[in-house]
């Protein structure tokens, strides 16, 4: 594989990662599909995916840096507030949202690793799509928490319970948390914003652990490829997050669910038939 070819693969996969990581469509499903089509699979590919995920995480940090610093009591200028009441999102909300998935993830780590195969990803894409549709149909007409600062401790914990579904590869962490948020009375926009904020510590922890385990597959010769993938994922994720938050004010998640079914069909056609 030539250097130019590697850089093209890095750019394409960085584009896919940045576009899908925070949308409720499953980045895992897309990376499996595209990686297979490009012939980029194996230990090096898995390590590359871990590295470019850090680019996506950085996009969230840049997008919500003021809010993230506020969670730990560091404020720059006016303190952001998005809600109809006097409540405020705190670090406790984030911790409550993390606990269920962290506990289940640690207890079932080995079993979860066995789920990383195309067939399980295909099923997760379908079930996650059904959950998105259910969230749209069953959500309260008037959400109890229209803004992210209205989210209660109970709602944060319940969203965290839904996040456990994302331990199933292909389910989509954002899809699980946003759907869960809507079902417990959080508005579509606020649930999406909370999902992004919750992603930072969750993904840093998971990605950091995966990167540590993958250090043996890293070499300086791969630096240009990994750098291109990282930067591409960062830029595309930044654009994707801004666009997504703008779009969901106007449309439901049902189109995303339908798209998931299409991706599941593609996985079936490529890996099962």
UniProtKB/Swiss-Prot annotation:
The chain crosses the membrane at residues 7-27, 45-65, 89-109, 115-135, 152-171, 189-209, 221-241, 253-273. It comes from the Bacteria. It catalyses: di-trans,octa-cis-undecaprenyl diphosphate + H2O = di-trans,octa-cis-undecaprenyl phosphate + phosphate + H(+). One of its GO terms (molecular function) is undecaprenyl-diphosphatase activity. InterPro entries: UppP (IPR003824). GO terms for cellular component: plasma membrane. Its main location: membrane. Its EC number is 3.6.1.27. GO terms for biological process: cell wall organization; peptidoglycan biosynthetic process; regulation of cell shape; response to antibiotic. It is a multi-pass membrane protein. It is found in: Cell inner membrane. It is an enzyme of class 3 (hydrolase). Keywords: Antibiotic resistance, Cell inner membrane, Cell membrane, Cell shape, Cell wall biogenesis/degradation, Hydrolase, Membrane, Peptidoglycan synthesis, Transmembrane, Transmembrane helix. It holds the Pfam family BacA. Bacitracin is thought to be involved in the inhibition of peptidoglycan synthesis by sequestering undecaprenyl diphosphate, thereby reducing the pool of lipid carrier available. Belongs to the UppP family. Catalyzes the dephosphorylation of undecaprenyl diphosphate (UPP). Confers resistance to bacitracin. This is Undecaprenyl-diphosphatase. It comes from Erwinia tasmaniensis (strain DSM 17950 / CFBP 7177 / CIP 109463 / NCPPB 4357 / Et1/99). The lineage of its organism: Bacteria, Pseudomonadati, Pseudomonadota, Gammaproteobacteria, Enterobacterales. The gene is uppP.
